[in-house]
């Protein structure tokens, strides 16, 4: 039932969408129906030098059903749907009868412009789905192989308003672990905002930087958000899965990417790579789960040997860009007036972090290895 378009790539603003052709919709998924189809042979592809582990945490599941706040017509056969709040997930739309072959376009965005008109998420981005009418009565579109982060939907090519619009908030099926309420409504709102934000970011077994632009599991974001997420949610299995992805991505020489999954050379620095250490330690502190330490301690040591190779007179210096990693950042969000690109600033921040990593490794060694072995490592 899928049309001629692909589903995009894993590059910023290029995640694409789905083109569903109602004319190809199957009446059912029984063996008899499926056997009548002309199936394309399965292709086996060998990708050398890449480790890929199965996702070892809860799957993504629908967590909340969201109804639109408003549906209004903004042009000839054009409708604007306001879901009332942002969400990361799927949309389902029921259309009145469409002519066979008629195309309906759905575009997604987080915001409106100053005139409260639809503002594209990115001028050259791909954030849209298409539905092609079957001409057979009531038509229904629902995402199956892609997802979007949005609050607003612009529907074009529809003479009448959609009969029904439903949003599905989706995230990894981790459980709630916190509650908070006080007499200050602002603090209550901040707590609710942070908690809901994570529901849109913790997706597919790791935490993304943004669910629309990049969908990348940056180690820097992981470090910055770890304590908050692990306080709010029971996420030990999410971090186990995420740390396994870091192990899969470490190179033979001990070099680490700045994010996992690692589809292209993304930006970062030591604070990003060292998440394998700090994330494992924080998971132990929050959940008492020592499995990450036991499993990934050798990976941490391997990376620190890579750090040592670029250490001069006791201080880490810039390592080179590679085909899997770019830039060399220190404080990515420095206060106004601080030149975060200055090498002195980058070196200061990076070496402070490495110092913290080494201190943490000493604590990890108390848990993971015997005292004689630990003393031998220290000496």
Positions of predicted regions on the chain:
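Single conserved hydrophobic/aromatic residue that forms the stacking wall/gate
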Residues: 367-378
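Aromatic-rich carbohydrate-recognition surfaces in CAZymes
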Residues: 131-161, 186-190, 198-203, 215-365
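Extracellular/oxidizing-compartment recognition motifs
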Residues: 1-211, 237-240, 257-261, 291, ...
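Intrinsically disordered, low-complexity segments enriched in Ser/Pro/Gly/Ala and basic residues
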Residues: 155, 378-379
